[in-house]
Amino acid sequence: MKILAIDTSSKLCSVAILEDTNLIKKLELNNGLTHSETLMPLIQKLLKECNLTLNDINLLVSDIGPGSFTGIRIGVASCKAFSDSLNIPCVGISSLEALAYNIKNDGIICSTIDCKNNNCYFALYQLNSGIYNVLHEHCAMSASDVVTLLNTKYPNKTINFVGDGIPSASSNEYLNVENLGIAGYKKFINNNYISENILPLYLKKPQAQIQLEAKLKEKI
């Protein structure tokens, strides 16, 4: 099965083609342009370098967030458009779940993504023999609250941190589009997806909206 994975959740635009869980090739680009300008040319370049066309793709996987609000919308919309026009399945994977796949050792995985002002997007997973089970659903909370939660619920456990939400504790900080594809493939073969239901995952309001609401409150 040939898989096209798309990640536009950060400044980096990343695409990859996999054969099941094996990477064929990936391309990443951060040239200062918007994802709406770079995504399609990057996909076309990737397909050409792999001697493939979109008709050869059997499964689409998109990062649904959390992350860049605009970037996520572009990636999800593109994935759904390909899915509808080519009649192939589309799987959505959260950034936090894809990050967890950076860790290969069994144990508890804390995935975090910085969302400014000492806050982070957060989710907790248990990896056991290649299976990633959710211990705590994705949410937005302060970095200090994440640490408190972990110390309270798992005081004697080793925690594997991944992502940039808690800089002092994190490693393997960046989402790998290859892992995004692998996570999507696993959901597909377990029939744990609904193509029509793929939607952006927003865990908090955009910063601009938060600032605007704060200014409006000051005027009241």
Question: Which residue stretches match the model-derived regions?
Answer:
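N-terminal beta-alpha supersecondary unit
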Residues: 1-64, 140
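Acyltransferase
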Residues: 171-220
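Residues at secondary-structure transition points
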Residues: 30-38, 69, 73, 77, ...
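Generic hydrophobic alpha-helical segments
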Residues: 39, 43-46, 50, 99-100, ...
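Surface "functional belts" at beta-alpha junctions
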Residues: 22, 31-34, 89-176, 202, ...
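DPxDG-like acidic metal-binding loop motif
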Residues: 59-90
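Phosphate-handling active-site elements
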Residues: 49-55, 84-93
